[in-house]
Every structure is written in structure tokens, then in C-alpha cells.
Amino acid sequence: MGNAESNAYRNHLSRFLPEEQSDVDGLFDTLSGSSSSAAAKNGKAMKKTMTLEALKAYMREPLPEQMTVRLYNGMRSIDLTGKSSALSDHVAKEQFVIFMSNLLKGNADEKITIIMRMISTTEGPVKGKEIQEFTEDLIKSVVHVLSYRKELKGWTLENTRDSAGGIKALSSQLLSELKLADGTKAVSPQLMEMSFDRSVIEDWVYRVPQISAFLSVVLRQGLHVLHSLPDQTKDIVNLVPGCKGIKGRIVSLFDIPSIIYINSHLPAELQHKWRLLFSSKLHGESFSQLCAHIVNKGPCVVILKDTDGFIFGGFASHSWEVKPQFQGDNRCFLFSVFPSLAVYTYTGYNDHYMYLNHGQQTMPNGLGMGGQHDYFGLWVDSDYGKGHSKAKPRCTTYNSPQLSAKENFTLDALEVWAVGDMPESAETKGKKSILDVDPEAQALLEMTGKSRHSEGLREPIEDEDDDN
């Protein structure tokens, strides 16, 4: 290895802290062990290299084989001499270190040569179909390795929707961000046969942070390297939020890819934890029960499924309050999970972010987001089971299309998740209503004929910590 090559290698090595270097060295020694021991038997001082077979053997359980092959091709694409664009036969330690350095600590320009070769082993532009296959493999690998390493933080493949559809939906969403050289977005199905050069892919990786984050997860968790060191996983620490409150055999309307995508659009301070407040499967099909479980619980994600199978919802940035006025702020958004995955943010046209009303004769009663009275982007009627998503052509508040299969839909299931930490006003410590603490006070009220106005709209606070 010449001086220039040696200097480049040392520069990449210097990006790693001493304990990280030790981690990377140990991993390469493990991966190259079989080939080096064979060389030692022959009495030859051969340079250690890694083979595809060794990498496959190491990654057999943590990662799908297609992704292992892609990683190996990425490693082989590192040109140590600067003279050849061909893939090497084996992977040398210098290639391995530079590969890890570029993907984990590099910018979009440093990552792009590797990613191009992970997409296709042939040099030059890549087809849309090849990018789609790479993206689907990448998302599938993230779901697989997080499940395998038990890093889904309370979510499981059993308590969420089947991820197969979610993988395709998230892949399509990320691919929709591909921009051609003239700045226009490629449209399916033409996208599949189109060719994209290095500059387009580099721009895509730069603008779509999920690609780098997913590669980081696959490397750290797949190779089991640099995954436990402090400050090295900031980009992926809240990729999946902690899950609280799923009990029994409840299966969420979310799948793992959609949880990852929706969570990435929440304010950063809310991304670390989701807590199930209401599920129609668990708490029954009742609007008063819905209100009782979600009022004054902090920011929430609402998700519902209509009887045609469409899944969609919205993020409420403030605690829900029962009142005949709009509430919330411009951090609110609507989203679709199935048949397509997308997020629709505010337009600035109006401030009709979120609305919750119950028991009034002169104003609409129900839960709504976006649009206007009787013409909401998302509406769940207080006559539980009915709803609408009106958007001709788009919801004025969020620029969302019709989210349900039919404009007026029938509700099949509904969930509400509190996101982030519970607000102090909703915490149980010293905050119980006198009616919860003192049953005699409740009885006295009833004896004197006083009605409990909060009955049905206020959830009795349980003694156990339901946050665990």
C-alpha cells in the first residue's frame, strides 16, 4: 500500500475513537479468521481478507442474505489504488475500515459510491427497479434485525400489522422523493424503467435521511458493532419509539415501517415513547369512552381503519379538550398508512388543526382534523361508527387527499396513542379527582341529586402504573 493510500486509510481510521477502533479490529479479525488460519497452515504470511462466505456465515441469522450480499459488494467497491473501478475478489481490512467509516460517519458524497454498488454491481447509472429492490431489502433488513436483536422496544411482529405491506409502502414513499436532473419527481410506473445517475442518487440520499439511518441500523445491529457506545447512535436512538400499553392479544393498526415513518415526523421531544390510550378492540366502540381515555393526555397520534381496509389518521400536537372551538397548532398533520404511506403537513391556509366536541346541540359533535365543520379532512362522528374524509380536491388545512376509501366511511377500528412523556396535569401523583379518592363524596353528590358532569368524559385513574 503506497503512502497516499496509507494516509487515506489512517484518516478514515482516525474517525473512530480508540474503543471503536478496537471494536472494528476485533470484528474484522473474526470475519477474516477462517481464511487467515488456512494461510497460516500453509506457512504463508498472507494478508488477512474476508470472503462472502465468511460474512454470510456471520450474518446468517441477523440479516436476510440479500442484504449481506449487498453489504459485501459495498465493501468490495472501495478502490484502494485509485486505478480500478472493478470490484475486488475479497475484502481487505483497509476496505472494511473505509466502508464502515464512510457509511457510519461520512457525508452523502462519501456514501454514494458504496450505495451505488450496493444497488447494482455494474458501473454507471442504475434503474428505478434496482433502486426499489435495494430500498425494500434495506427496510426489510431493518425490521428483521431489530426484531432479531430484540430492539423493537415493546413492539413485536405479533402485536403489529404484517410488515410485508408496510415495507413496500415505505419503499414507495421514499422512492417518490427521487428527483430527476431537471428537479422534477419521477412518477411510477415509469420510474421502474428509468435510469438514474450518481448525482441523482446522491441528492436522494442527502434529502431522505431514512436511507443513511437504515444503513446505520443494518451495520451496527447486523454486525453487532459500535451499537453500544454512547453518542454513536444518536441518528437511530428514536428510530423506533418505546411502546407502552399494548395488552393481551391486541394487534395494532400500525406496522413497524409505518411506526418508524410517522414517528420521524413527530417533534423530536415526542419521538421516544408511544403509549396506547384507546383501542376500540380493547375499550369498546363508544365515543364517550374515546373521550374519557384521550382528553388531557398530551399530544396524540390517532389512527383508524375503515371497513374498506384503508388505514389513516392524524397527529394532534396538543392535549385533546372537549370544546366547540378548533385547537392545536401547525405541528399537527394528517397521514395515510394503507394503501399508501404519506404525511400531509399544514398549508397555512387556516388554523383548523384539531377539534373535539360532545353533547352540544348547536355545534358538530365528534373528533375532527383539518378542513371545516361538516367538511373535515378527517372526521369521526360522536354517533360512533360514522366518519368522513372530504377533500375535493384537497383538505384546505393539510393539503391531504381523501384518506378513506369512500368520502363517508364506516369505522372498523380506532386507536389513540399518547406520544412523548405524559403531561404533568395527567400524572397520577396527587392529581386524582376527589371523586376517585373519596367514594363518600361521590355518594353524597348522588344523594343530593347533583349530577356528575364529567361522567363518561373522564377516565378514573388507576392505581397501578400503566406506563410500564
UniProtKB/Swiss-Prot annotation:
Pfam assignment, any one: TLD
Stretch list, region Disordered: 445-468
BP GO terms, sorted: positive regulation of protein localization to lysosome; regulation of cell migration; regulation of cell population proliferation; response to amino acid; response to insulin; response to nutrient levels; response to oxidative stress; TOR signaling
GO CC aspect terms: cytoplasm; lysosomal membrane; membrane; nucleus
Keyword Cytoplasm: yes
UniProt main location, coarse: membrane
TLDc domain span: 252-420
Compartment(s) where it occurs, according to its Swiss-Prot or TrEMBL record: Membrane; Cytoplasm; Lysosome
Function: Activates an alternative mTOR signaling to regulate cell proliferation and migration.
Protein name: MTOR-associated protein MEAK7
Taxonomic source organism: Gallus gallus (Chicken)
